[in-house]
């Protein structure tokens, strides 16, 4: 799930790597909060258009996109003659996202909300990778994350701020200790900015990207999928420090 103003092409480095290791990588694009929001706008109006798209309505629509895509994939998997027919294992679905896409992933993967309960969670998602996580701006953070039942891997950086929104590097790191214990992991990349998890630098970056960040993201994310989607004991032992 891409970030605000992004597209399904924004993290090809992840998709290519995971696909090369046997995973079917499906990239969502969320109408209403994707690149179409700003592309045709004059430069002076682009930030305002992006802020407008960072709405509660789009947040809900994004979360609703996920089950719709999973339903369609299941249909294609059982459709004779389709190129994906029989190639998908619906029992082993993982979800990942960055920034607004990370927020979307949180919603689908077990975050609770004061008014909405757990109504956005999709039980088909068995593991989640959240890049640039978001702490709730209101309410009890422990109530939000204390009942997450599936494995989560959080990734952020010590300079992980975004041009839109109130999240800080410190608020992003508040999510991990609030998660229910068991099969939860966090990677904090030193000096990594918000763009560390994207295909290319973002406007407003303050420093050169560290190529080792992508290497760490790829290695850890793949080990996480292997551990919890393939039940690979060696990968899980490596993640937990026992291997």
Positions of PLM-derived features:
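Residue in the alpha/beta-hydrolase core beta-strand immediately N-terminal to the catalytic nucleophile
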Residues: 92-94, 129
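The feature captures the conserved acid-bearing segment of alpha/beta-hydrolase catalytic domains
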Residues: 117-191
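Catalytic nucleophile serine of serine hydrolases
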Residues: 3, 99, 132
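Active-site rim elements
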Residues: 52-57, 139-141, 204-215
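Short substrate-entry loop that stabilizes the transition state in hydrolases
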Residues: 1-38, 137-138, 161-165
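Gly/Ala-rich beta-loop-alpha elbow adjacent to hydrolase catalytic centers
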Residues: 97-101, 105
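Alpha/beta-hydrolase-fold serine-hydrolase catalytic core, especially in secreted/extracellular enzymes
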Residues: 190-243
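Alpha/beta-hydrolase active-site loop
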Residues: 41-90, 107
